[in-house]
Amino acid sequence: MDELLDCLDSELSYFYQIFPKELFQEIAYQTTLYSMQTNPETPFAVKEEDLVSFVACVLYMSIVKLPSTRDYWSSSIGIAHVTNIMPVNGFEKLKSIIHFADNNSADKDDKLFKIRPLINKINEQLNNIPFEENLAYEQIIPFKGRHLIKQYIPKKPHK
């Protein structure tokens, strides 16, 4: 376990431990395939680097909230971290066509078939990452204070 943690020396290497480059290659392939199926005259070729930039923008947008997506690129309140990563038109085009699975090989019984490959790959990667099991259960920590959502549980071992 220590060897793996030592090689994860940066945030980016930890990110790629969960979201490997093969996943981005597969998403780029599926997105390009979908683009060719929907608009064969002018297909939108997606590169792996574009997807990494897209995910970086989405992650940053999930932390810094603005009312509209275009606000991240606006001249008045624009966020430099996002504007330097990719242009707004490229972001919105990629957002409209991103695909994780081929629609032709869809399993109609699976409600999540459109994102199933993404879920499976991330679960597989998370199972490979070692972790320490540090857990503090509520019942181990006695609490005598008051709280609005506190419930009386008569069989709780620590009261």
Each PLM stretch: what is its role?
Residues 1-159:
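N-terminal initiation segments
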